A protein has these predicted regions:
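Hydrophobic/aromatic beta-strand elements that line small-molecule binding cavities or substrate pockets
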Residues: 75-80, 114-120, 131
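Short beta-strand segments enriched in hydrophobic/aromatic residues
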Residues: 35, 93-95, 133-134
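Low-complexity, intrinsically disordered terminal/linker segments enriched in charged
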Residues: 126-145
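Exposed beta-sheet edge and beta->alpha loop/turn motif
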Residues: 92-123
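A solvent-exposed, acidic/Ser-Thr-rich amphipathic alpha-helical stretch
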Residues: 9-10, 30-87
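Short solvent-exposed loop/turn micro-motifs enriched in small/polar/acidic residues
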Residues: 14, 71-73, 111-113
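Short, low-complexity N-terminal intrinsically disordered segments enriched in polar/charged residues
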Residues: 1-37, 41
Length: 145
């Protein structure tokens, strides 16, 4: 039998797990539906250029990843409720490049990269902030850049 705290933690994880599943399905619309329309995103390795609105910068980057890496996939290794509104997901993302991506010319190479997504949910259980970390130098190295 689950405790109330365990049930709350599972409930909190659901939008975040659903977001990662939607990403795995390449369903950008569903990913964005799980987010607050005024939510923010930080792709930490990109510095200031990696900060913006989920529905603008997030939509653009995830859309480009799905387009340039059509076999993109992810494995959710862990989802941990850090507090009542925050979930940390440990994810492995992989894919084979088929188009130029940002400053990385297409060489048809494959990447396999550990990522950390930290999701914050608002009172309406919508994702209102996402912070994403990965080793960008290793990502570029795997793609031959």
């Amino acid at each position: 039998m689950q405790t109330t705290a365990q049930q709350q933690a599972l409930s909190l994880q659901n939008p975040c797990v659903a977001f990662m599943f939607s990403y795995q399905q390449k369903d950008l619309s569903k990913m964005l539906e799980l987010c607050d329309s005024s939510g923010t995103v930080e792709f930490v390795p990109l510095g200031e250029a990696g900060k913006g609105k989920i529905g603008e910068l997030g939509k653009t980057i995830w859309g480009l990843l799905i387009d340039c890496f059509p076999d993109i996939d992810n494995t959710l290794d862990a989802a941990v409720a850090e507090d009542s509104n925050t979930v940390r997901c440990q994810v492995v993302i992989r894919g084979t490049q088929e188009k130029d991506f940002a400053d990385i010319p297409n060489q048809g190479k494959h990447f396999d990269s550990d990522h950390i997504f930290i999701f914050h949910l608002n009172q309406n259980h919508k994702i209102d902030h996402i912070r994403v970390w990965w080793n960008h130098d290793d990502f570029k190295r795997q793609l031959g850049a």
